[in-house]
């Protein structure tokens, strides 16, 4: 059960890195027989770690689990970086710098799914902040990432979502 629990947690960590926040059902079925560090990590992935359990987490995740968004820069492993960024986002502690770093990390690794998810977060923030030029740029980047390039001369209003279209 120990190896199976670890495998389930790795699967769930990958989903958190891609901003898929859902229960880790595979692990939850094994929780009662799992080791304390595995249980702590599962709680962390849900954004529900308690302070007493932080020392049980992998070293790379401890500072981020304590809410230190600056710790992301110190995490060497790209997947661990994205997991920490995902947890920070899930708990409402992801700054624009965290989002930017997550985008850079996913992009540099060539990981399309996490990149699209993080670009989507940045797009939503740009739209909410009324930065239409940034929203257009992000939509173009997302289209390129998905393998469908948008023409550079496409009218701006066609790149905006229906709710964000400029008024005449």
Show the residue positions of the predicted features.
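N-terminal Sec/ER secretory leader and immediately downstream segment
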Residues: 1-33
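Structural motif corresponding to the intra-repeat A-B loop/turn of tetratricopeptide repeats
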Residues: 14, 18, 91-93, 109, ...
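A cross-kingdom marker for long, charged
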Residues: 122-168
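Alpha-helical solenoid repeat scaffolds, predominantly canonical TPR units
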Residues: 23-26, 98-105, 118, 138
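Solenoid-like repeat scaffolds
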Residues: 1, 27-35, 68-76, 103-113, ...
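Structural register within alpha-helical repeat arrays
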Residues: 6, 11-13, 83-86, 102, ...
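Residues that mark the junctions of alpha-helical repeat units in TPR/alpha-solenoid scaffolds
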Residues: 4, 77, 95, 108, ...
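Extended amphipathic alpha-helical interaction segments
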Residues: 35-111
């Amino acid at each position: 059960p120990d190896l199976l629990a670890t495998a389930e947690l790795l699967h769930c960590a990958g989903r958190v890195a891609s901003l898929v926040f859902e229960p880790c059902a595979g692990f939850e079925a094994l929780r009662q027989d799992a080791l304390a560090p595995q249980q702590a990590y599962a709680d962390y992935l849900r954004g529900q770690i308690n302070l007493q359990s932080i020392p049980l987490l992998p070293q790379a995740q401890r500072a981020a689990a304590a809410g230190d968004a600056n710790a992301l820069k110190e995490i060497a492993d790209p997947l661990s970086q994205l997991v920490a960024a995902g947890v920070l986002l899930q708990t409402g502690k992801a700054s624009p710098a965290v989002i930017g770093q997550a985008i850079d990390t996913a992009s540099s690794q060539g990981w399309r799914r996490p990149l699209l998810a993080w670009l989507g977060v940045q797009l939503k923030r740009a739209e909410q902040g009324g930065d239409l030029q940034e929203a257009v740029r992000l939509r173009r980047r997302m289209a390129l990432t998905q393998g469908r390039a948008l023409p550079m001369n496409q009218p701006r209003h066609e790149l905006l979502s229906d709710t964000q279209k400029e008024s005449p």
